[in-house]
């Protein structure tokens, strides 16, 4: 299902565990330590993964502004110049690692920046950022825990941004409720990982996990859930955009497949985040039996993710 050279799978039980394994793979494969991540990221709740969200960040994590067009680093720039501006942040992080004698291990992003609020990003950013990282001796890790398994209208989020990673982390939908995650990588990186480290998990790589994961893939393919995501997702986004025009406090509506993001703001023409409204909306929806969440740097973006059979 993955693009070459992602042909080796290491199984785990949670997205957090998958990210831990991915970071370890990157560090062992490169001999580096430094990881570049976004400034509004969430990749798990273990000691190492939560550091990327709440710190301490230094010395081995460098957070960079996530790319976006709604609330960009600088207003009114042409898209190519805005892309270059965000790429400068990647270059800055690489330089700071070098200045502090910390070899670069890699860059870790969610393939669609889901926790950042599913922003529309400057065209070409991901692929160009990946090139910068690889030229500096690092590898590219993409987190598909939220985006993977057809959620976005493609099998993988990295397909949307045309950027194949060196290491990919998967979770959540992989087991459709059963504790199952995985890390995909190349044979070369997998070989180094197993030669230089020891990984064991009592409940990972079991026949039951394999059966559950295979069943999930069967359902996705046999029921054409990818096709359903695209047709229903387009309809859902169009409907949300339609009613959003009636409300001043909706600044933007974005979406990929069955993943719709609604940016809550203080009022029409304003880009000031409205976290209070987002929290209230999440609670009101819960009272009506519909579970959504709020995300983004300011927790003001509503995340709507219906099941793929929606």
Protein language model features and the residues they cover:
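Conserved N-terminal phosphate-binding loop of PLP-dependent enzymes in the Aspartate aminotransferase
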Residues: 1-310
């Amino acid at each position: 299902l993955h693009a070459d050279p992602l042909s080796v799978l290491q199984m785990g039980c949670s997205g957090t565990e998958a990210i831990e394994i991915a970071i370890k793979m990157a560090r062992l494969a490169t001999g580096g330590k430094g990881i570049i991540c976004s400034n509004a990221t969430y990749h798990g709740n273990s000691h190492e993964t939560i550091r990327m969200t709440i710190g301490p960040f230094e010395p081995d994590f460098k957070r960079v502004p996530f790319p976006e067009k709604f609330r960009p680093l600088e207003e009114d720039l042409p898209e190519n110049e805005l892309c270059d501006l965000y790429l400068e942040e990647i270059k800055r992080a690489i330089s700071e690692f070098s200045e502090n004698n910390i070899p670069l291990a890699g860059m870790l992003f969610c393939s669609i920046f889901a926790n950042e609020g599913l922003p529309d990003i400057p065209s070409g950013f991901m692929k160009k950022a990946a090139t910068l990282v690889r030229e500096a001796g690092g590898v590219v890790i993409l987190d598909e825990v939220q985006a993977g398994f057809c959620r976005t209208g493609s099998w993988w989020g990295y397909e949307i941004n045309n950027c194949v990673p060196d290491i990919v982390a998967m979770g959540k939908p992989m087991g459709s409720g059963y504790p199952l995650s995985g890390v995909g990588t190349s044979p070369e990186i997998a070989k180094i990982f197993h030669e230089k480290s020891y990984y064991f998990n009592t409940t990972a790589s079991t026949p039951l996990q394999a059966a559950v994961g295979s069943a999930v893939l069967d359902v996705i393919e046999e029921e054409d859930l990818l096709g359903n995501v695209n047709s229903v997702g387009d309809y859902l986004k169009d409907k949300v955009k339609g009613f959003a025009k009636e409300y001043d406090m909706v600044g933007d509506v974005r979406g990929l497949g069955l993943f719709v993001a609604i940016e809550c703001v203080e009022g029409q023409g304003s880009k000031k985040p409205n976290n209070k409204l987002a929290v209230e909306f999440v609670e009101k929806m819960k009272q009506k039996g519909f579970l959504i969440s709020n995300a983004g740097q300011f927790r003001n973006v509503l995340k709507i993710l219906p099941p793929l059979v929606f």
